[in-house]
């Protein structure tokens, strides 16, 4: 049966207390030591060819050197671990330096190698120590995915909108209950101003063209205007757009000559319509 738990140390021997601890700590993976492998004198990486990538569930590394945590070693531990596998590293630390420095350095190396959730744990008794040194242990986990792996994102299923019925497809006609008392009399909406007869159009608004005479029963005032024009001997053009060769026709009778066609009319402005007085047709007494 292939090993799933690996104990690695850079010393010549490994204490039996450490082996016992590993069997108890990783009981299911170690299977009472049947799936446990111990590797000593692992000063170099010559042993990396012993294990294929992603083949171990747990790797425990014990070191008697304060400077053991080289980046290439941590990367190798990440390679041989399965996704979701755990790594446990215990080393000696100088009491003068304290654990802060080694903690930051080792945690940085683990994160760069791809491990997650590094945390300080209780150290294992049985590792030889010298005066002025103390034990320090750190544990981390390999992510549950492989480096370079890919997976497809699941798209949420979009439910098709129910098609709306086409116009005229409904066979059920709505019932309309109309109360006759609710109907409004249209005549009640008209005011007295609306009922008044509109004013008759002025002579200028009559539909009769300028070249035709007023109708027989003219009521718009056009016949009266034509009668005034006949009495004065002026054309419609002379009244609507009066012009003067001498420039005195619009000033009044005091300035007009004896043959002026506008003689007898009130003063007016040249180019503007001449207004005829209402007493023009009144007989002189």
UniProtKB/Swiss-Prot annotation:
One of its GO terms (molecular function) is 4 iron, 4 sulfur cluster binding. Monomer. [2Fe-2S] cluster binds at residues 206, 215, 218, 220. Component of the cytosolic iron-sulfur (Fe-S) protein assembly (CIA) machinery. Required for the maturation of extramitochondrial Fe-S proteins. Part of an electron transfer chain functioning in an early step of cytosolic Fe-S biogenesis, facilitating the de novo assembly of a [4Fe-4S] cluster on the cytosolic Fe-S scaffold complex. Electrons are transferred from NADPH via a FAD- and FMN-containing diflavin oxidoreductase. Coiled coil: none annotated. [4Fe-4S] cluster binds at residues 246, 249, 257, 260. InterPro entries: Anamorsin, Anamorsin_N_metazoan, CIAPIN1, SAM-dependent_MTases_sf. Keywords: 2Fe-2S, 4Fe-4S, Cytoplasm, Iron, Iron-sulfur, Metal-binding, Mitochondrion. It is found in: Cytoplasm; Mitochondrion intermembrane space. This is Anamorsin homolog 1. Residues 246-260 are annotated as: Fe-S binding site B. Residues 1-150 are annotated as: N-terminal SAM-like domain. The C-terminal domain binds 2 Fe-S clusters but is otherwise mostly in an intrinsically disordered conformation. The N-terminal domain has structural similarity with S-adenosyl-L-methionine-dependent methyltransferases, but does not bind S-adenosyl-L-methionine. It is required for correct assembly of the 2 Fe-S clusters. GO terms for cellular component: mitochondrial intermembrane space. HAMAP family: Anamorsin. Belongs to the anamorsin family. The keyword Transferase does not apply. A motif (Cx2C motif 1) lies at residues 246-249.
